[in-house]
Structure formats: C-alpha cells, structure tokens
Amino acid sequence: MGKYDRYISFKNANWESQSSGVMDGLKPHIEAADSPFWVYFMRQRELAHQRGLDDLRVLHNFLPTLRELLEELDDQPTLALLEQLEESCM
C-alpha cells in the first residue's frame, strides 16, 4: 500500500475495505439488538445509503457513540478497526 496524506486525498487509504471491516465487526452486536441504538443506527445507515452516502460517512456520524458502545461491550478488535479507520480516513 502506498503512502498517503488523509488531509489531501484518500488515495491508497483503502477506506472502503476498512469501513466494511468495521461494519462486519458491528454485525454481531446489531443482530443481538441488545441496545435500541442498533435499530436507530441501521435505519440511519439505510437513509444515508438512499441519499448516496457510504458507510464511512455513517460511521463518522456515529463515531463517539460507536466507540462508547464498543468499549462497554469490550469488543477490542472492532474498536481497533474503528480507531484505525478514524485515524486514516476521517
């Protein structure tokens, strides 16, 4: 992977794959539906996709809440993916 500067371009940032990885990590929590937040999150994701927005935008919009929930759930792998995505692409 080439070097990039996130403030200039997402070229070589692999943001689509990183976003997909975070969404894959969230999937078990969404399916468990232990929090009403997940229903709201998925509805907002659906609306964002209808407006042509991608998962990077959705994840960015909910970053603090997702971080807090992942910490509470002690999901360190998904939290690490989210933090990597934030650092490299947000």
Curated annotation (Swiss-Prot):
A single GO BP: nitrogen fixation
Keywords annotated in UniProt: Nitrogen fixation
Pfam families assigned: CowN
Keyword Hydrolase belongs to the record: no
Its job: Is required to sustain N(2)-dependent growth in the presence of low levels of carbon monoxide (CO). Probably acts by protecting the N(2) fixation ability of the nitrogenase complex, which is inactivated in the presence of CO.
Family named by the database record: Belongs to the CowN family.
Name assigned to this protein: N(2)-fixation sustaining protein CowN
